[in-house]
Swiss-Prot record:
Belongs to the DMRL synthase family. It holds the Pfam family DMRL_synthase. This is 6,7-dimethyl-8-ribityllumazine synthase. 5-amino-6-(D-ribitylamino)uracil binds at residues 15, 47-49, 71-73, 104. Catalyzes the formation of 6,7-dimethyl-8-ribityllumazine by condensation of 5-amino-6-(D-ribitylamino)uracil with 3,4-dihydroxy-2-butanone 4-phosphate. This is the penultimate step in the biosynthesis of riboflavin. It comes from Saccharolobus islandicus (strain L.S.2.15 / Lassen #1) (Sulfolobus islandicus). (2S)-2-hydroxy-3-oxobutyl phosphate binds at residues 76-77, 119.
């Protein structure tokens, strides 16, 4: 049986564009390398603006998972903490609401610009890999009928 292809949506923040644009390039090339199809890329102003775009993608039957890409850079106030924590919370809520993976490829909070630059490839590729693995594994869960012994899904 041939495995169904994995269809991704990507939501990328424009804020800190020098970082997020490189993250998008890394994510697109890594998805291609892993034979996943990126169906839609949506650019939003900032990470705090991601949830609505994520929700719109999750509503589509042709999207199996959503990858988020962004960079929340530390400032002089606690704004970065609020943005990062609220966005992460909503991402989890949307994933469980729609029963589809939404992965967190958002650098920060607390990261300096230099630290964010160092983490571009790591965060982008890990978010893509996590989305693909979660789709594959949740498909295996969906195929389970009855379990008499311990099943390890990896």
């Amino acid at each position: 049986m041939q495995e169904k292809s994995i269809r991704l949506g990507i939501v990328v923040a424009e804020f800190n564009y020098d970082i997020t644009q490189l993250m998008l390039q890394k994510a697109l090339s890594h998805a291609k390398f892993l034979n996943a199809e990126v169906k839609v890329v949506i650019k939003v102003p900032g990470t705090f603006d991601m949830p609505l775009a994520i929700k719109k993608l999750l509503e589509k039957d042709f999207i199996d998972a959503v990858v988020t890409l962004g960079a929340v850079i530390k400032g002089e106030t606690k704004h970065d903490e609020i943005v990062a924590s609220q966005t992460a919370r909503k991402i989890v809520d949307l994933s469980t609401e729609f029963n589809k993976p939404v992965t967190l490829g958002i650098i920060g909070h607390g990261a300096t610009h230099e630290q964010a630059v160092e983490r571009i490839e790591e965060y982008a590729t890990r978010a893509v890999e996590a989305a693909i693995k979660l789709v594959q594994r949740t498909r295996k869960i969906d195929e389970l009928k009855e379990v008499k012994e311990t099943v390890i899904i990896d």
